[in-house]
A protein has these predicted regions:
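Interdomain "pre-motor" coupling segment immediately N-terminal to P-loop NTPase/helicase cores
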Residues: 16, 21-78
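N-terminal pre-P-loop "Q-motif" helix
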Residues: 92-107
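P-loop (Walker A) phosphate-binding loop of NTP-binding proteins
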Residues: 105, 116, 146, 319
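Pre-Walker A (Motif I) flank of P-loop NTPase domains
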Residues: 107-113
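Conserved helicase motor core of SF1/SF2 NTP-dependent helicases
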Residues: 112, 123, 127, 131, ...
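Conserved glycine(s) of the Walker
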Residues: 120
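Conserved helicase motor core of P-loop NTPases
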Residues: 225-370, 380-382, 511-512
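C-terminal accessory regions
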Residues: 375-514
Length: 514
């Protein structure tokens, strides 16, 4: 956080608790306390930024490791013949940028692939993997993603069934669990590591990831920097791209569904600030002027969509969690009364203020050994056990679990959820309210993230002017991180030590050479 912002917010919050004006604090008093905290090492000051010590250490160590990897000599592989054979056998024709992304993965030990939905990222990954298998039959490959749903989707789309979550692949718990952990973990044995949805990775997770990569391993980071940034501290993916030291390939040609996907085109338009969207059966807008009316329309549309496609393929995504009839929590209660009404007390269980029923659609809200935060499933039974109620859950094939009452605190109803919670997931159909009441939350990246969760159909319900407002609002709140600047600083230091020309110096040499 910026020093000035921190001091102003601290002064405001503290003085709100002091009813007598004469006793209220002055700005200089807050500044003096902050300076004392800096001198004691309770916070870290870098330029105009104030860090918690652990966050500064994470940013600094991650920057140092990335810079060392960028300076580390990479042995470019000659893949031309293998690549041509793979393309022929897979029956794919790569665009020039897709081919550049494949080559970058073999010319550098760290590279980035970005692009909106439908631009062929999956085809590139499948090609990279197949080339690698041909070049290194005994090489170890690891695919990872921040969420369970994203890792399973990665496995399905690439045909590589060993994709894991970053937490699982790195053997992590939560950041809170990590505070007391002192044992240094061994580097991963993988020779090629591909991480999808990297825009979701925060500073803590990035620190853990880069600390576990062995020398010589190739890393490919894949993601969409125009989606919402990570929930936790940092803006890692954007900083890696903007530092201009990591090779980045931007895929911008739409391929999905033979170029017939309105979702892919409209995602591109929204990203460009263009309000002239295409509408049709797979991208619909239904007008509604208020939350109560919108909620009725959402419920009606939801019932129609689940009848057509199945309840596990349709998701309502709301900008708001709890405020108003079109918020995720209130929609959950209303929809449940329609699609899964009360039958008997034996089929219900109350956990605090939450009530769950047999056949409810639910979401896991915490990582465990068997399920990940954001995983969706259904309640299959509620029964009496020796030590209280037992609840049977179905999270998909091979992931049928039984929870105790204590475990149930990590579940939410999930007929509807927030756009933030949907990050890393995909659904056949997405239904999304867009109302004036949601204006405070609606920015271009939130809208873009919501519609790009859908594979086949988007249904927007609300006010057109709110949709246009969201498309035009691109004032993304700045995250005060210096990761990119620190990568640049360490890279220059390591490059000079190794006698490697810096990028700008290399450009000057080429210019002088004619």
């Amino acid at each position: 956080m910026l020093r000035e912002t921190l001091q102003k917010e601290a002064l405001r919050l503290l003085n709100n608790k002091i009813p007598v004006p004469a006793l209220r604090l002055q700005a200089q008093e807050v500044a003096d306390v902050l300076q004392d905290m800096i001198l004691k090492g309770e916070v870290v000051a870098v330029k105009d930024n104030i860090y918690l010590p652990r966050v500064f250490a994470q940013e600094d160590e991650t920057a140092r490791r990335i810079a060392m990897r960028l300076v580390e000599p990479s042995e470019p592989e000659r893949i031309e013949r293998v690549l041509e054979r793979v393309k022929r056998e897979m029956g794919v024709v790569l665009s020039s940028k897709q081919e550049a992304a494949v080559y970058a993965a073999y010319r550098h030990n760290l590279s980035i692939i970005t692009g909106s939905p439908g631009t062929g990222k999956t085809t590139v990954l499948k090609t990279i993997l197949e080339v690698y298998r041909r070049l290194y039959p005994d090489g170890q490959i690891v695919l990872m993603a921040p969420t369970g749903r994203a890792s399973r989707r990665m496995a399905e789309s690439t045909g590589f069934d060993m994709a894991r979550t970053l937490h699982s692949g790195l053997g992590l718990g939560s950041e809170e669990d990590d505070v007391n952990r002192t044992k240094q973990q061994e580097p991963l044995s993988a020779d090629l590591i591909i991480v999808d949805e990297f825009s979701m990775v925060d500073m803590w997770l990035a620190d853990k990831f880069f600390s576990r990569i062995k020398d010589g391993a190739r890393i490919v980071l894949v993601g969409d920097p125009d989606q919402l940034p990570s929930v936790g501290a940092g803006n890692v993916f954007r900083e890696l791209i903007d530092c201009e030291l990591v090779p980045v390939t931007v895929l911008d040609q739409i391929f999905r569904q033979s170029k017939d996907s309105l979702i892919a085109y409209n995602a591109k338009f929204i990203n460009e600030g263009n309000t002239k969207l295409y509408y049709g059966p797979d991208f619909m807008f239904m007008a509604s002027d208020n939350q109560a009316d919108a909620a009725e329309r959402i419920i009606s549309r939801y019932c129609r969509e689940i009848e057509e496609s199945g309840i596990d393929r349709v998701q309502i995504l709301s900008p708001f969690r709890s405020e108003g009839a079109a918020s995720a929590e209130q929609l959950n209660e209303a929809i449940r009364e329609v699609v899964n009404p009360f039958r008997s007390a034996e089929d219900e269980i109350k956990i605090g203020v939450k009530v769950f029923r047999v056949n409810d659609r639910i979401m896991q809200t915490k990582n465990t050994a068997k399920v990940s935060n954001g995983d969706l499933g259904f309640i299959r039974y509620i029964k009496d056990g020796e030590n209280g109620k037992r609840v049977g859950l179905d999270f998909g094939v091979g992931r049928e679990l039984e929870y105790s009452v204590e475990d149930m605190v990590n579940l939410d109803l999930a007929y509807a959820t927030t756009i933030h919670k949907s990050m890393g997931s995909e659904y056949e159909t997405v239904i999304m309210p867009l109302l004036k009441a949601h204006s405070i939350m609606l920015y271009r990246n939130l809208l873009y993230t919501g519609i790009t969760r859908a594979k086949k159909r988007v249904v927007l319900i609300g006010q057109k002017q709110v949709l246009f407002m969201a498309i035009h609002r691109n004032e993304i709140s700045k995250r005060n991180t210096l990761l990119g600047a620190r990568i640049d600083m360490y890279f220059k230091a390591y490059a000079r030590r190794a006698g490697i020309p810096l990028p700008n110096e290399a450009k000057k040499e080429l210019k002088h050479a004619g």
